[in-house]
């Protein structure tokens, strides 16, 4: 039985838009003795979470000896910071379980969430009464898979609209969730892949991210497949 771990002991922040999504969680796929873990973010355009990008991916990571935690994050009608707060909290929660390294992986819109977690993080609040909030939310690595990296150009408009809601055409919000515009030299290393013929999420998304990482001397590996 895979344990379901709530991210918060009480109602999660930013829940006013969707009380039925008040308790996001991670589903545990632990490998005994594993020193590293990956938070898995399924795609779905910020409207749903695709099942085939969740549990099967965790099981694949398990076969490689890596523990995995599938994130049940909030989607439309929750907007903007709600999904990101879930991803950041998930990294802290998984880190609290004793893993030496915690990465984050995401597909399509889940890849956008993965990239946001890798570019908007903090070291934790040492004065927080919640011990989990004292931990860093910076992933040790991130793995965007055919990700909606940018909400500015070459974007998947459905993901942009579902994530930002009424703010979908406000550039400060658009830029904040466009990872290529938020990379710094402290951004964690990345493993990026895409297909050159992707019609839903253009390959330029991954190319923009790789370019930004290169300019900031952040280690990355990029794979573009022809199909």
Predicted regions and their residues:
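Primarily recognizes the serine-hydrolase "nucleophile elbow" in alpha/beta-hydrolase
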Residues: 89-158, 174
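Short beta-strand element of the alpha/beta-hydrolase
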Residues: 35-43
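N-terminal cap/lid segment of alpha/beta-hydrolase-fold proteins
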Residues: 1-33, 80, 157
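Short beta-strand/loop motif that positions the catalytic acidic residue
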Residues: 186, 192-194, 198
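Mobile cap/lid helix-loop segments that gate and shape the active-site cleft of serine hydrolases
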Residues: 10, 147-182, 188
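Catalytic nucleophile-loop/oxyanion-hole region of alpha/beta-hydrolase
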Residues: 49-51, 56, 69-101
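Catalytic histidine neighborhood in serine/cysteine hydrolases
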Residues: 214-227
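Conserved alpha/beta-hydrolase "acid-adjacent" motif
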Residues: 199-208
């Amino acid at each position: 039985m895979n344990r379901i771990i709530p991210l918060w002991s009480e109602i999660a922040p930013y829940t006013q838009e969707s009380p039925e999504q008040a308790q996001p969680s991670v589903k545990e796929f632990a490998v005994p003795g594993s020193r590293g873990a990956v938070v898995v973010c399924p795609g779905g355009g910020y409207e749903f979470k695709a099942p085939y990008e969740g549990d099967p991916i965790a099981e694949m990571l398990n076969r490689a000896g890596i523990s995995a935690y599938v994130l049940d994050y909030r989607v439309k009608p929750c907007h903007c910071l709600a999904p990101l707060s879930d991803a950041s909290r998930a990294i802290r929660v998984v880190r609290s379980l004793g893993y030496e390294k915690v990465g984050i992986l995401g597909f399509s819109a889940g890849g956008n969430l993965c990239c946001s977690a890798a570019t908007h993080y903090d070291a934790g609040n040492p004065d927080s009464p919640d011990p989990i909030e004292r931990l860093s939310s910076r992933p040790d690595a991130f793995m965007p898979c055919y990700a909606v990296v940018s909400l500015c150009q070459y974007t998947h408009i459905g993901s942009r609209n579902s994530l930002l809601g009424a703010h979908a055409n406000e550039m400060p919000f658009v830029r904040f969730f466009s990872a290529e515009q938020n990379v710094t030299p402290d951004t964690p290393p990345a493993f990026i892949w895409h297909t050159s013929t992707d019609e839903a999420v253009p390959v330029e998304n991954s190319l923009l991210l790789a370019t930004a990482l290169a300019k900031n001397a952040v280690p990355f590996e990029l794979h573009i497949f022809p199909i």
